[in-house]
Amino acid sequence: MKASVIIPAYNSKERLYNSLLSLNQQECDEEFEVIVADNGSEDGTLSMLESFQADFPLIFTRIKENRGIAYGRNQALRNARGDILIFHDSDMLAAKDLVAKHIKAHENEENLVVCGLFWKRIYSFYYERFEEEHKEQLAKLTGEMPKKDKQKLLEEADIKNGSFLDKSFDLDTDFIDVLKKILDEYGDDLKGYHMPWRFFITNNSSVKRKHVVDLGLFDEGIVRYGFEDYDLGIRLHQAGLTFRLRRDIVSVHQEHPSNCKSVDDIRANIAYMCDKYNNIRSLDVHLAFNGPFPPDMTNRIMADIQKLLESQKYDMLLNLFLELLHVVKERNIDPDWRKKSPRVTAKSFDLQTVRKLLPKAKKKLGVNDFANALYALVNDLLHVDLRSLDVV
């Protein structure tokens, strides 16, 4: 078996049907299978899977209780036989060449992570629980508002003949804008970009199965919505794999009410990730989630950090930087942070030694961006001007 398409599903029967229908249209000479983990759905997903007429080996497993996306994906992974894993969610519509291009991309590439295009969107159904922004956008696109829940907005013929691609649109958010600007600067090969795992989004990505198995699959400790793909991407990056964006490998997300129950999910996931990667060799994680710096400066800081990591004599600077990013995290995710005792104070660190060491590192290694960032954090969070050690 050349490839296994991994799909977790939860109460998405109608969108999953469309997704499987798009996979039925694949123009691929290689053998591939599709594995669906029904993650405790209550909408008849299992009966749909049992009756679906697939043109490929379709394997599905029923999980009685939803234990998170990571758990569901792992259940599917344990049944996978393919050399290549293609991650493709239940709400995604695959272009006809998606599977073939993912497989082809890994030819003669042992250590590659392929990140397909992930910002295409389409309205295949109307949902009464849509957020207002969805309803406003849908009204602009269609000229009128559908009247009943789960009203079909996309015909099967559109999926079979591929015309759904012409009806799709780009997701327009600050997050996507940031990622597009990163691609403009560093290219689709992401050379020189130190956080390529940010592009590993498991609705359209692939990697050889052996790497995921070696890393212990997805982290089932992540039970709230999101971040399990980031976590695996971080570990793939730390294992030395190369990341590459492929704009020509296209899948389209079928819009639906958000699975994120509240901002608390995001806060909890950030806290979990920062605790898990609480070391100076994972500062990219803390900068990505908590860093108060612009994206271009953030990457330059990471380039400086790579230089500093080459010698243990600068670990004091990096540990201080890490601890201060934890303080930024607590400010960002804890609404009551002002009422609590500070995590650290100026007395928590040997700032006299830091004051002497930082200019030396700056002069020897040219780590100007890191130095400026550390000066700024110490000033803002510890109320100390590190250049003079005068209390502000």
UniProtKB/Swiss-Prot annotation:
CDD domains: Glyco_tranf_GTA_type (cd00761). GO terms for molecular function: glycosyltransferase activity. It comes from the Bacteria. Keywords: Glycosyltransferase, Transferase. It holds the Pfam family Glycos_transf_2. Its EC number is 2.4.-.-. Gene3D superfamilies: Spore Coat Polysaccharide Biosynthesis Protein SpsA, Chain A (3.90.550.10). Belongs to the glycosyltransferase 2 family. This is Uncharacterized glycosyltransferase YfnE. It comes from Bacillus subtilis (strain 168). The lineage of its organism: Bacteria, Bacillati, Bacillota, Bacilli, Bacillales. The gene is yfnE.
